[in-house]
Amino acid sequence: MQSRYEPVFEREMGCTEAEWLGWLPAAVGACAWQRNGQSATVEVPPGALALRWETRPPRVIALMRMPVLHVHFTFSGLDDAQRYQFMRRFDLYMQRGGG
């Protein structure tokens, strides 16, 4: 989790598209969302979040292969505090492993 989220940013997720789509409903909580191919729009009152993703080649470390999903986040109509509040939940639901 970050202390601040810019209106537009990108990140790499260590998951497949199928995993991402399985986690997305819980990550956005009560916010309505709609998928369109490799993108989605999430209604985050009073604004919105546009997501775009693309599968990248996996990371290979010795015999381990980790999937890579490159995700673009574009917020509109939300201030810093509103973006932070949404992303705090989103990141907690998307977080895997750790330690």
Residue ranges and their predicted role:
Residues 28-29, 91-98:
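A common structural junction motif
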Residues 85-91:
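Short amphipathic alpha-helices in soluble, non-transmembrane regions
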Residues 1-27:
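Terminal, regulation- and interaction-focused segments at domain boundaries
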Residues 7, 38, 47-49, 67-71:
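A generic structural signal for short beta-strands and their flanking turns/coil linkers
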Residues 11-15, 73-78:
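Short beta-strand-to-loop capping motifs
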Residues 27-37:
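Short secondary-structure junctions
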Residues 17-22, 79-85:
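Short, conserved charged micro-motifs
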Residues 46-65:
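A short, structured beta-strand/loop element
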